[in-house]
Amino acid sequence: MLCIGIETSCDETGLALVRDGRLVHAVMSSQADIHALFGGVVPEIASREHYRLIGPLYDLLLREAGVGPTELDAVAVARGPGLLGSLLVGMAFAKGLALGFDIPLVGVNHLHAHLLAAGLERELVFPALGLLVSGGHTHIYRIESPVSFRLLGRTLDDAAGEAYDKVAKMLRLPYPGGRILDQQGRRGIADPRLFPRPYTDNDNLDFSFSGLKTAVQTHLSRHPELVPSPDAAQAVAGGHDAPEGLRNMCASFNEAVAETLCIKLGRALDGDDGVGVRALIVAGGVAANSYVREHTARLAVSRGLELIVPSPPLCTDNGSMIAYAGWLLRQGGLSHSLDLEAVPRGRAIPDDYRQGPAGCS
C-alpha cells in the first residue's frame, strides 16, 4: 500500500510517500526564515505560503520518487491541532486527491503522528509512555497501540518549546531559538538553584512553563548585562561563544526544562498508568534538544525501559510522520469521509474514523 502524507499544521509544508511501512521519499519547505522577521509564526502568512508551495511540492515528490499519481492507494493529512488556515490548505489538497483518484482519505492527529514517527526507523514497543514536547504542546500519553492513545497530562499554558522561543527572544536571538540555547548551554555550567522546576509541587501530570519563563525574565532584569547587543546576538546565533554568564544561564534553563519533564514522567511511571509500560517514546521538536535526550535516556535506563526517540529530522513537523501514521491507520481499515473537518489548537480531536476492511485501498 502506498500512502501519501501531507503536513501543513504550522509553518512547514511537508509531503511524503510511505509504502508498506517504509519511507519512499519526502519533500519539505520551511518558512522559518520568513517568520523570523516577525519573531514568530504569522498565521496569515503561513497559510498563504502553504497555498503557494503545496502544488509544486506534490509534483516534485512524485517526480523524484518516480511514482505516478494513479499509484497512490491512500492520502493522509494532518487534521489538527494546528493553525486553522494552514490546516485547511492541506486538507483541501488532500480531499482533492482523494476525490480525484477515488482513494481513501485519512485525517491524522498531528500529535499522535509525532509519537509514531520513530516507527519509520525502528520497531515500536507497546504499551509505552509517550512524551510529546513541542512548540505548542507538552503532553504525556499512555499508548497501547498505534491507534490507542490516552492523554494523561497536558500543557496548561506555555509549552516547553514556546518557553524556549520566548527566552530566545528575550536574548535577541532569532526565531526559532531552541537550537541556539541548547548549543550555548553545552558550553556553560548549569546552576540547579538558578531556575525553578515549574509546576511540580503537586500530584498531577500537567505542565506549566510560564513560571520558568517569568523566572528567566526576572533574572535578566536583575542582570541586564547578560542580554547581548544586536550585533553580539547575531554572532551568538552564528555559532560564536556567548559570554560565560549567558552560557551558564542557558545551561541552567535547559536543565530546568529537562528535569521538569522527567519529574512528570517519573510520576506517571510510578502510578497506575505506568503499570506494564515497556518503552518511553519522546517526540516533537524539543525532543531534538540534547538535554531532553540525555535526561530521558537516564530515566529510561533507571526504569528498565526502551527509549524510543526519532532522529532529529523526524522530530520537527514533517510529511513522513503523517504518511506513516496514515498507513498504520489504513492497516486497521480506518478512514474518513470527505466531510472531515480541520481541528485548530485548543479543541479536542474527535475519534470519528470510519471502519472498513483492514489494509484495503
UniProtKB/Swiss-Prot annotation:
Its main location: cytoplasm. One of its GO terms (biological process) is tRNA threonylcarbamoyladenosine modification. GO terms for cellular component: cytoplasm. Fe cation binds at residues 110, 114, 317. It is found in: Cytoplasm. PANTHER family: TRNA N6-ADENOSINE THREONYLCARBAMOYLTRANSFERASE, TRNA N6-ADENOSINE THREONYLCARBAMOYLTRANSFERASE, MITOCHONDRIAL. It comes from Nitratidesulfovibrio vulgaris (strain ATCC 29579 / DSM 644 / CCUG 34227 / NCIMB 8303 / VKM B-1760 / Hildenborough) (Desulfovibrio vulgaris). Required for the formation of a threonylcarbamoyl group on adenosine at position 37 (t(6)A37) in tRNAs that read codons beginning with adenine. Is involved in the transfer of the threonylcarbamoyl moiety of threonylcarbamoyl-AMP (TC-AMP) to the N6 group of A37, together with TsaE and TsaB. TsaD likely plays a direct catalytic role in this reaction. It catalyses: L-threonylcarbamoyladenylate + adenosine(37) in tRNA = N(6)-L-threonylcarbamoyladenosine(37) in tRNA + AMP + H(+). This is tRNA N6-adenosine threonylcarbamoyltransferase. Belongs to the KAE1 / TsaD family. Substrate binds at residues 132-136, 165, 178, 182, 289. The lineage of its organism: Bacteria, Pseudomonadati, Thermodesulfobacteriota, Desulfovibrionia, Desulfovibrionales. Binds 1 Fe(2+) ion per subunit. GO terms for molecular function: iron ion binding; N(6)-L-threonylcarbamoyladenine synthase activity. The keyword Plastid does not apply. SUPFAM superfamilies: Actin-like ATPase domain. The keyword Iron applies. The gene is tsaD. Its EC number is 2.3.1.234. It is an enzyme of class 2 (transferase).
